[in-house]
Design a protein with these regions (language model features):
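Catalytic core of the metallo-beta-lactamase
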Residues: 1-11, 27-28, 70-127
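Short secondary-structure transition/capping segments
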Residues: 59-70, 94-96, 128, 201-220
Length: 220
């Protein structure tokens, strides 16, 4: 529906970057989906691909539950940490940021736009390591986020951060404000003012706004 707002035909999409294999991120390319993107080539981290081959099972809720294996039949290109390549003149750099999943990949586009998937949760007071109950390894997630910040700082890169669930920000300091803290699903804001909560107001995500090319950021 939302691609239709922009006049984009899903069947015309030829390349899709996969941050990680959770169904809420890859459902539209799963074998039992409607097949909207059946012609697209998928780019996924080599480590993350082990979930897709069945070598590793995805565990959530502090490893209490195993999720069903995700099946994808599209052509895949396996990527590695630090790899850079181009698609139709667009430069893409890969950053391995494990923790939420073992092979979670973050993509920097033309040095300006960082697609962070489920590595950062933008709370109203800044970014946190993503929801603790859904991580394979929370300590690794926190450490990986700090390493990502250091890599970007070392290259003086301050991109726009586009998250998988909590909107976007172009405020570097805000994005990493609480990188050493987990977004806990057990902290309730009504009882705990320090509990992180989603700062992204989805009421802003309308057809009119999308066509104007602007959705409000957070931390600005």
């Amino acid at each position: 529906e939302k691609m239709g707002w922009l006049g984009i035909d899903p069947s015309s999409i030829r390349h899709i970057l996969i941050t990680h294999q959770d169904t809420d991120h890859v459902g539209a390319v799963e074998a039992d989906s409607l097949g909207l993107f059946r012609k697209a080539k998928l780019y996924v981290g080599e480590t993350e691909n082990r979930y897709l081959t069945g070598e590793v099972r995805r565990k959530v809720i502090y490893h209490l539950y195993k999720l069903p294996q995700v099946t994808i039949r599209n052509e895949k290109v396996l990527l590695h940490d630090g790899e850079a390549f181009e698609i139709d003149g667009i430069r893409i750099e890969c950053f391995l940021v494990p923790g939420h999943t073992w092979g979670h990949m973050v993509y920097l586009i033309d040095g300006k736009y960082l697609f962070t998937g489920d590595t950062i949760w933008l709370g109203a007071d800044g970014g946190y390591s993503f929801i603790s109950a859904l991580a394979e390894d929370n300590r690794l997630a926190v450490r990986s986020l700090a390493e990502l910040e250091a890599k970007l700082e070392a290259r003086k890169l301050h991109p726009m951060f586009l998250t998988g669930h909590t909107g976007w920000t172009d405020n570097f300091t805000f994005a990493f404000a609480h990188k050493d803290k987990l977004c806990s699903p057990f902290k309730k804001r009504v009882h705990d003012p320090s509990a992180p909560y989603d700062a992204y107001d989805e009421s802003d995500d309308t057809e009119e706004r999308s066509k104007s090319g602007y959705l409000k950021g957070v931390g600005r």
